[in-house]
């Protein structure tokens, strides 16, 4: 049975780690990096998660450009799994494919949308409630101002004739 950790980040840069197993873990199995998964699997009701990366139990990273879930040795010049110290340096690195499997130990995911993780977990109140009321008032004032401007323009045209 699959069991792994899911590290979820949002646009604010905050991250949370969740452990999933059994049925919740099965929602991730077979998915590729870049696919979307329902947030209910980790307790984020109403959210959608995009799979962004991961690693196996030995710490080998998942790469989006390697198909399947098997290990593959690549000659890398940089990117996911290897950071060269000199220009032109290359190294053969073992990486995993882009598909989540039983060998996956950690999956990295990002919340799709602007809702922070704390709001999705119910730890904080959404900040949008205060902003909506103010923006509606501003929109009404702008409409009244525009209407007055049109009447003034009509008077100016009549005076010009």
UniProtKB/Swiss-Prot annotation:
MF terms (GO), sorted A to Z: structural constituent of ribosome
Pfam families per UniProt: Ribosomal_S6e
Entry keyword set: Ribonucleoprotein, Ribosomal protein
An example Gene Ontology biological process: translation
Residue ranges with Acidic residues bias: 122-161
A GO CC term attached to the entry: ribosome
Domain of life of the source: Archaea
Stretches the record annotates as Disordered: 119-161
InterPro entries: Ribosomal_eS6, Ribosomal_eS6_arc, Ribosomal_eS6_CS
Family annotation (NCBIfam families): PRK04290.1-3
Protein family membership: Belongs to the eukaryotic ribosomal protein eS6 family.
Protein name per UniProt: Small ribosomal subunit protein eS6
Organism: Haloquadratum walsbyi (strain DSM 16790 / HBSQ001)
Gene it is expressed from: rps6e
């Amino acid at each position: 049975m699959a069991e792994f950790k899911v590290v979820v980040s949002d646009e604010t840069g905050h991250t949370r780690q969740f452990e999933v197993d059994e049925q919740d873990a099965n929602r991730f199995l077979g998915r590729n990096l870049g696919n979307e998964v329902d947030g209910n699997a980790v307790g984020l009701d109403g959210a959608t998660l995009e799979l962004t990366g991961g690693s196996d139990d030995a710490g080998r990273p998942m790469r989006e450009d390697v198909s399947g879930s098997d290990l593959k040795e690549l000659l890398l010049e940089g990117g996911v799994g290897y950071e060269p110290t000199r220009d032109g340096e290359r190294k053969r690195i073992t990486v995993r494919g882009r598909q989540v499997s039983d060998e996956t130990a950690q999956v990295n995911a990002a919340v799709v949308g602007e809702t922070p993780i704390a709001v999705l977990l119910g730890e904080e109140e959404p900040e949008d409630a205060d902003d909506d009321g103010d923006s509606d008032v501003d929109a009404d004032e702008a409409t009244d101002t525009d209407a007055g401007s049109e009447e003034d323009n009509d008077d100016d045209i009549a005076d010009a004739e």
